[in-house]
Amino acid sequence: MRKDKMENFEILPTEENLIKTLEADLLGRNQQLSYFYNLLLAQKGASTIAVDGKWGSGKTFFIKQSTMVINAKNPVSIIEKEKREKILSKLFLTESDNYDDCNLAIYYDAWENDNDTDPIVSLVYEIAKQLGMTYTFDPDTDFFKLGGAVLDVFSGKNLKGIIENLKSDNPLSKFKEQKALEEKLKDFFSEALNERGNRLVVFIDELDRCKPSFTVRLLEQIKHYMHDERITYVLSINTEELQHTIKNYYGCGGDERRDRQARLL
C-alpha cells in the first residue's frame, strides 16, 4: 500500500537559503528589502523601527536578509567577495569603498537569551562577538558588574528597590552607578563603530515569544542605557502578542496598556 508523505516546504533562514532566495527573488521581497535598506540608511539620531507580523509570516527571514544586505554593503564586513556580489547585484546595490557611508548590522535572537537575568549583558556580548571585538572593560567600572546592581533598581516593577535606595545613607550612589554604566556603553559603541561604520543597526528578533519579564526588561534597559544617537533598533514583533505580554506583566489593559507599549518602543 502506497503511503504519501507530507512535504515540508518551510525554508529555514540559513545563509545558503538567504542568498538563494535573494538571487531568484523567490519570496518576491527584493524590492521591499531595497526600500527597507534605504529607510534604515536615512535614519538620523536614535530610532526604533518595528517589523510587525503574525507568527509564521516570515519576519525572521526578512530581518536576517536585511542584516546580510547591510553588512554586504559595508566594505569592512567579513562576507566573502563572491557572496557579497551575489547579494548586492540582485538589489541593484554596489559595494561601498567607504565605511563612513555604511551601517553595521547585528542580529540578536531574544528568545534564545530569555533565561538571562540581565538582557543588556547578552545583547552587548552578541554585538561584540558578531563584530569580532576584543573590547577591554575597566574592572573598576565594568558594566557587567555595574549592571547587576543598577539594573535591579531601575528596571521593571522594582519600585520597592528605588524607595529603599532613596532611604539609604547615600541615595545618589545608584544614580552615579547608572551614569557610569551609560558612559561605559557609549565607549563600547564608539569602539564598535570605530573604522567599521557610520551607524549600528541592531535587529532584535522573537521578542514576542520571550517571557514577559524578559521582554519588558530588555526594552526598558535599551531605553535607559543603550539609547544612542548612532543606533537604530529594529524590533521583529507581533504587536498583538506584545500587547498581551505587556498586559500580563503590568496587569493593565486598554489605553494604559497602549501607553506603556508606546513608551517602551
Give the location of each predicted region:
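Catalytic P-loop NTPase motifs of RecA-like helicase/translocase cores
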Residues: 114, 192, 207-211, 242-243
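Short hydrophobic/aromatic beta-strand immediately N-terminal to the Walker A/P-loop
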Residues: 48-52, 107, 203
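P-loop NTPase nucleotide-binding core
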Residues: 57-194
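Conserved catalytic network of the ASCE P-loop NTPase/AAA+ motor domain
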Residues: 41-44, 55, 97-101, 191-196, ...
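The catalytic "switch" region of P-loop NTPases
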Residues: 2-24, 29-33, 69, 196-200, ...
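Walker A/P-loop-proximal flanking segment of P-loop NTPase domains
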Residues: 1-95, 121
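Conserved strand-to-helix beginnings and helix N-cap segments that scaffold or border functional pockets
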Residues: 117-121, 212-219
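Catalytic acidic motif of RecA-like/P-loop NTPases
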Residues: 52, 56, 205-216, 223
